[in-house]
Design a protein with these regions (language model features):
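Bacterial N-terminal signal peptides
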Residues: 11-23
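Bacterial N-terminal signal peptides that target proteins for export
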Residues: 1-13
Length: 490
């Protein structure tokens, strides 16, 4: 089933050896950021480009994260920055990065700022104070008469976001200037990753995979979901991950059927499964790996049946994934396997059967239990841009799932004449599988001839049960080599 997938072995050591073999590749250089800006300039052709960075949070105890399009173009991660580029004949004629000025009083509270004089060395872009942006913008925009914005610019929105407000302030007195949004063009550039980006994704995913291994040892009936979250996020930080890439999901029992459950405060019970959907961010690049585990270390027969359907669906998508294959093809293949499995266990009437919604629409019955897409791109964002057709350098997830929600009959399947046969037919299976939610998610890189699996945490039923049977006395000892990855990024 998974013959086309090249992986790095089942254990931690093979993965670690591959990562350490390329220590210099795990950073995106100023030269690469310049190539990205040049590629955008080719697409814009002529005029001004204004890339808008994220603003500083209103309180200094709220973490700041740079928005992904701006980080992609500049690598600059301080707040309030803006990049102004003048493009002529598809090339950058001039560019300036406007940043917060040095301010020793503010830096006493918030930390060191690079400042305009330090920007060139760090980013390769000439720097000026953001306080000078208005004057520079006024001089150039009058000449060009139009501007291309990179950022969430949406002047028609009811509530104006920070990007729109900052652009609107610059445009005061320039009503004749036309504005286009070229964030989509930046997203297209982000869809295929460079070698440096792929190395960062491998490392982020390796840390995430290690967190899953720790969780498999830590799980036990009576523990709370937040204890699992603590193990996960401790593992992330101790190996240099700056933060979780998204809110960690640890959903047990009925919570396993909630796709993006975030409360993480239920005491897990003997006989539960728990969905652990986690991802570290390393060097700005996000992993996203999910495992579904038996809390007591052994899957029940019913849990195994649902789990195997999901695993087979993932395997089918893996099997066909290679350059030239469309995302839609993989999605259809995975969905077909899920539908066939659900029909076999009695949760739907047949593979192609439908049900009637409250609005009178006919929807495939398998969507009662599998209501999301097969996967998504990964990169600077955990849901990163990716193309409709696979090509080498694309990084993405495959994550089918089945969720047997406890409110299926009361709130999900309308009690109307058209659905009576369905409701009667699937009730016995529902009672067997209720409160079982299963999602299996892995991360991949498309190669010239197939697929590289970069998240090899145990996922076969036997592998998981074997991993959970091993004694666990707490997190593994500090791995100095892994911590050294971070030093090489400085």
């Amino acid at each position: 089933m998974r013959g086309c997938v090249r992986n790095w072995g089942r254990g931690l050591l093979p993965l670690l050896l591959v990562l350490l073999a390329a220590p210099l590749g795990a950073q995106v250089t100023p030269e690469e950021h310049a190539e990205r800006r040049n590629a955008l300039a080719e697409r814009v052709g002529e005029g001004l480009v204004l890339a808008v960075g994220s603003v500083e949070p209103p309180q200094d105890y709220i973490p700041f994260f740079q928005n992904s399009p701006f980080r992609y173009l500049t690598g600059f991660v301080e707040p309030n920055a803006m990049l102004l580029m003048e493009v002529r004949d598809g090339a950058i004629a001039a560019e300036v990065l406007f940043v917060n000025p040095r301010d020793p009083a503010t830096e006493t509270w918030e930390g060191y700022r690079i400042g305009p004089d330090g920007v060139l060395e760090v980013t390769g872009i000439p720097g000026r104070s953001v306080e000078e942006l208005g004057e520079a913008f006024d001089a150039l925009v009058s000449e060009h008469g139009e501007i291309a914005v990179v950022g969430a610019y949406n002047p028609g929105a009811l509530i104006q976001n920070d990007v729109t407000q900052r652009v609107a302030a610059l445009l005061e007195g320039h009503s004749e200037v036309s504005v286009t949004n070229v964030t989509r063009e930046v997203a297209d550039l982000r869809a295929v990753k460079s070698d440096a980006e792929l190395e960062l994704l491998r490392r982020s995913t390796a840390i995430t995979t290690q967190a899953h291994r720790e969780v498999m040892g830590a799980l036990a009936p009576g523990k709370n979901e937040f204890e699992v979250q603590a193990v996960v996020e401790y593992t992330f930080r101790r190996y240099g991950s700056e933060r979780p890439a998204f809110a960690s999901i640890v959903g047990s029992g009925p919570n396993s059927t909630v796709l993006h459950y975030k409360t993480n405060d239920r005491f897990m019970e003997d006989g539960d499964v728990v969905v652990v959907d986690i991802g570290s961010s390393y060097g700005g690049y996000s992993a996203d790996v999910t495992r579904t585990l038996p809390v007591n270390g052994r899957f029940t027969e019913a849990q195994s049946e649902i789990y195997q359907i999901v695993l087979d669906a993932q395997g089918r998508a893996e099997e066909i994934a290679r350059p030239g294959v469309s995302v839609a093809q993989m999605d259809q293949m995975a969905a077909r396997v899920v539908a066939e499995g659900l029909a076999e266990v009695g949760l739907i009437e047949s593979v192609d059967a439908t049900y009637e919604t409250a609005e009178g629409q006919r929807i495939p019955q398998f969507r009662l239990f599998y209501m999301h897409a097969m996967g998504h791109g990964i990169g600077l964002d955990v849901h990163d841009p990716w193309p409709g057709v696979l090509e080498p350098g694309v990084a993405f997830t495959i994550e089918p799932g089945i969720y047997v929600r406890p409110n299926l009959f009361e709130e999900i399947i309308p009690d109307v004449p058209a659905n009576q046969g369905l409701r009667e037919a699937i009730r016995p299976a529902f009672e067997r599988y209720v409160n079982i939610g299963v999602r299996i998610e892995d991360d991949y890189i498309v190669t010239e001839d197939g697929l590289e699996w970069i998240s090899p945490a145990p996922r076969e039923i036997e592998e998981i049960e074997e991993a959970m049977a091993r004694p666990w006395d707490g997190p593994e000892e500090r791995n100095e080599d892994w911590v050294e990855w971070f030093r090489r990024m400085e």
